Amino acid sequence: MLVSIITPFFNEEQTLAILLERVAAAALPAGMTREFVLVDDGSRDGSNAIAAEFVGRHPDAARLLSLPSNQGKGAAMRRGMSAAKGDIILIQDADLEWDPADYARLLAPYVDPAVSVVFGSRLLGHEAKRIYYHYYLGGRMLSAWTNLLFGSHVTDEPTGMKSFRRGVLDGITLGADGFDFDPELVARLLQAGHTIHEIPVRYQPRTFKEGKKVRPRDGLRALWVLLQIRLQGKQRRA
């Protein structure tokens, strides 16, 4: 079973090289192999060169895709997903907040063919680390809002460690360009009837000085996206 690890990045030269080495070294469950799909979202620093050097060392397993300008996480993810060849898609942000050492546990549930979506949760089994308390509260609010709207039981809706079988994309359309990609993905998956399984993962938050990009307004936008999709109802395919 092939796992496509998609890493969108924008100006992450301080963390990208370390992250990619950790992704390459991370253990996977027996019977799983990996491909690296790196998507440069218009970086203006040395990130592209770092990614290109990594691809040069892993030519059979890694690809670098580049957007002509900074278009946002959602645009980068759609580009990466369209190129991915794996049976499972795994989203790995480039900021070192999410530990690839958790891959084995994140992917283990896929031995059950009935499991289609697995997220990593910061709130299961570990004391959630936090630097900005309002982000912690915002995450709890987003999770509660998601559960209210869709009848789900997620504990960490805004988690940056998401995975799903490639086939789930056949029934949904994603159009968000920015960080609203995440709530859009969650809402569409739940709306399509998929159960989101969660496993505990580690989390090392970074500060704005260290390059954190998500802002409080993105949380407010996420609340609206979730509600908007709930009100729209299920997508219909022609």
Q: Model-found features: residue ranges?
A:
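Cell-envelope/extracellular polymer assembly enzymes that use nucleotide-activated donors
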Residues: 2-4, 35, 184
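Catalytic donor-sugar/metal-binding loop of nucleotide-sugar-dependent glycosyltransferases
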Residues: 153, 174-177, 186-204
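Acidic helix N-cap motif at the loop->helix transition within catalytic regions
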Residues: 14-18, 45-54
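Acceptor/aglycone-binding surface of glycosyltransferases and processive sugar-polymer synthases
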Residues: 67-83, 88, 100-179, 205-225, ...
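Conserved donor nucleotide-binding strand/loop of the catalytic core
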Residues: 34-38, 48-83
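Short, well-formed alpha-helical segments that are part of the catalytic scaffolds
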Residues: 12-27
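A conserved acidic beta->alpha catalytic loop
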Residues: 40-49, 96
